[in-house]
Amino acid sequence: MANQDAAQHDENHLIAERRAKLAARRDQAAEAGGSAFPNDFRRDSLAAELQAELGDKDKAELETLDRRASVAGRIMRKRGPFIVIQDVSDQIQLYVDKKGLPAETLDDIKSWDIGDIVAARGPVHKSGKGDLYVMMGEAQLLTKSLRPLPDKYHGLTDTEARYRQRYVDLIMNPESRRVFEVRSRVISGIRRFLVERGFMEVETPMLQQIPGGATARPFVTHHNALDIDMYLRVAPELYLKRLVVGGFERVFEINRNFRNEGLSTRHNPEFTMLEFYWAYADYRDLLDLTEAMIRDVAHEVLGTTTVEYQGARYELGEPFQRLTLRQSILEYGDGLGESDIDTFDGARATCERLGIPVKPSWGLGKLQTEIFEAVAEDKLDRPTFITEYPAEVSPLARRNDTNPHVTDRFEFFVGGRELANGFSELNDAEDQAERFAAQAAEKDAGDLEAMYYDADYVRALEYGMPPTAGEGIGIDRLVMLLTDSPSIRDVLLFPAMRPSAD
């Protein structure tokens, strides 16, 4: 505690010193009738660009080239006459030329602190160690940093502080910046992949009068002008399928969903999903498309289809394993046999042996799904599609033509984590109405995650929706896999957090 108090005292002292420097600078500018921070500097070079262009040149070649550069960035270190600045691409050194710079500029540079954002213009040289630097012929303070950065050797190591102060994390930790650069490229790669295959990107409502498309507890708000309760969407599914009814045969959306549920390493109340719908296709087409898309995006972003995640290696270039839900239970269920899962009494007894609390309303399909989640899901290490989910737990999926107990639905797993959920869509309006009614009854019985009855969506289906396949892929979890990030908070710029004491 004493060490923390001392550190806080030191930080407060540094902040006070910097505020005094800022006040003096403003006073000086006011007396001169100018601005403390003129906005007239224009950068023409990034650190990485200079390294790519000039890094292989020797000192003599650089002297001959007389390459001049205008650079800008945040001061990360000061070492003798050298100042290391960091821009969006990399770091580069500035050299304080005490002989060539005006006295007033040298005095100004003396007041610069680590964390300040500065600019410099001058010729590019190479040090005796082979490092590029810009000889400062001109120098300018662009922004004064009032708070000191964390220790340069330890960075921002407190995990919670990294999440709460992501701006500092991004300054100090190159790996954090890399994660979010990869995330951006993943989303761009998915968008490119789908557009190249004829899918159209659309936007559907975030605020909905009926939150449908997933079994989840929604966030509720109130629209004052309309005087009605509205909900942040839990999924865009029902609106996207309305578009298929309207004639858009291949649509997708990459956007946020909101679910008023718990926080964990896999769950955040707002998260990014890709959802796409494909008319005149079925879930088997989705299996092939999903496998190709994940493989393609991984190779585009990482340059390889081999992914390292938390000490394990996954090969996305090989055919993904495909098992039915029933097959996976029998394969991974530690001795479970057909009699343990194929009848209601057998499945209920199995749940009791496994310590799974059983609700009276559960049917055989729900029992089987709970058994799968208990004995098989976390063992699905290699890339795996699980198919034929029970109709009871798939209220929006089309029943299988030969076995109506199951649906033409799949989920995709890697490392025991679900990344995608897709199925041949239910396009029978009467069947959909019955399933909505069953879900509404569960909601009336106290199930806060059960779906609402959406009469307008049923009406849309009554106009006729072509055979359609649809899928959702969790972007956050996919990025976790591709960046070896153990928590969803590592791949969200600003994850949900409990309010801090300060």
Swiss-Prot record:
Its cofactor is Mg(2+). Keywords: Aminoacyl-tRNA synthetase, ATP-binding, Cytoplasm, Ligase, Magnesium, Metal-binding, Nucleotide-binding, Protein biosynthesis. It is found in: Cytoplasm. Mg(2+) 1 binds at residues 411, 418. Its main location: cytoplasm. One of its GO terms (biological process) is lysyl-tRNA aminoacylation. Binds 3 Mg(2+) ions per subunit. One of its GO terms (cellular component) is cytosol. GO terms for molecular function: ATP binding; lysine-tRNA ligase activity; magnesium ion binding; tRNA binding. The keyword tRNA processing does not apply. It catalyses: tRNA(Lys) + L-lysine + ATP = L-lysyl-tRNA(Lys) + AMP + diphosphate. It holds the Pfam family tRNA_anti-codon. Homodimer. This is Lysine--tRNA ligase. It comes from Chromohalobacter salexigens (strain ATCC BAA-138 / DSM 3043 / CIP 106854 / NCIMB 13768 / 1H11). The gene is lysS.
